[in-house]
């Protein structure tokens, strides 16, 4: 029922229309008694209408006003924010001990506040702390690189350098001897899944140093996963076409 989505405190409502203007789904309009929803199924549960109301007159059953937590701490100054973002560095030399469950949970809890297209969210995370599994993943990536070298792809020369370090010198420049790997995943049919995952991880890795953790983006592992996924897609299309 479209009448059940919004609750308007008519004594507070200014009828300024800012909630209507800011609704990303364009499903609100201004009526005689305040904002009205024209199509509740179009609501993406972003809570923008509730958050933007200057007098707290609007409630949304998907994002209840009573469950909102105001930010009480002072915001960082522009100078502090600039220096915080500027100091971001990848860590490529990790301590042997893996982060605790609590530390990982705190980091990924922050990640869920990252913007996602259409407020789609729907992120999944796989956390791996088993050393043998991490080594097996790095080995699988090295095997993929060897196949790329044999095929003479555009990355051949670069991968040869990586493989010499990994295979001959025993230098793990694929997983960096990290005690923990975290994979950010989205549903395959989510066309913005990759960008959602990248933005979520950006939040996580910016937060990590505040609890004493270091992070890096495992680009070789990511590239291997993307390449293998594309190979499977092409293979599936070919099988479909010729079967």
Describe each PLM feature range:
Residues 110-114, 123:
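Non-catalytic interaction/regulatory modules that flank or connect domains
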Residues 127-197:
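Glycine/small-residue-rich phosphate/adenosyl-binding loop
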Residues 5, 18-34, 48-65:
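Iron-sulfur cluster-binding cysteine motifs and their immediate structural context
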Residues 231-238:
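Conserved small/polar residues in nucleotide/adenosyl-binding loops
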Residues 1-3:
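Short, Lys/Arg-enriched N-terminal segments with co-localized hydrophobic residues
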Residues 37-52, 68-86:
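Short microdomains enriched in Cys/His and/or Lys/Arg
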Residues 21, 70-106, 239, 243:
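Specificity-determining recognition surfaces
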Residues 14, 107, 111, 182, ...:
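Small-aliphatic-rich amphipathic alpha-helix that forms the alpha element of a beta-alpha
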């Amino acid at each position: 029922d479209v009448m059940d989505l919004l609750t308007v405190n008519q004594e507070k409502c200014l009828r300024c229309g800012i909630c209507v203007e800011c609704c990303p789904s364009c499903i609100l309009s201004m009526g005689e008694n305040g904002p009205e929803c024209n199509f509740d199924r179009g609501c993406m549960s972003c809570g923008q209408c509730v958050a933007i109301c200057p007098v707290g007159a609007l409630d949304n059953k998907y994002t209840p006003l009573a469950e909102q937590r105001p930010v009480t701490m002072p915001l960082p100054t522009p100078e502090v924010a600039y220096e915080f973002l500027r100091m971001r560095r990848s860590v490529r030399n990790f301590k042997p001990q893996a982060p605790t469950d609590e530390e990982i949970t705190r980091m990924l809890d922050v990640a869920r506040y990252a913007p996602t297209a259409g407020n789609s969210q729907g992120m999944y995370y796989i956390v791996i702390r088993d050393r043998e599994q991490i080594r097996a993943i790095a080995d699988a990536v090295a095997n993929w690189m060897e196949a790329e070298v044999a095929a003479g792809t555009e990355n051949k020369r670069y991968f040869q350098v990586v493989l010499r370090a990994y295979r001959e010198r025993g230098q793990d420049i694929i997983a960096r001897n990290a005690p923990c790997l975290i994979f950010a995943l989205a549903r395959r049919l989510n066309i913005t899944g990759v960008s959602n995952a990248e933005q979520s991880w950006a939040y996580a890795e910016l937060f990590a140093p505040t609890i004493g953790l270091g992070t890096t983006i495992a680009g070789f592992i990511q590239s291997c996963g993307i390449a293998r996924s594309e190979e499977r897609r092409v293979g599936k299309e070919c099988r479909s076409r010729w079967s």
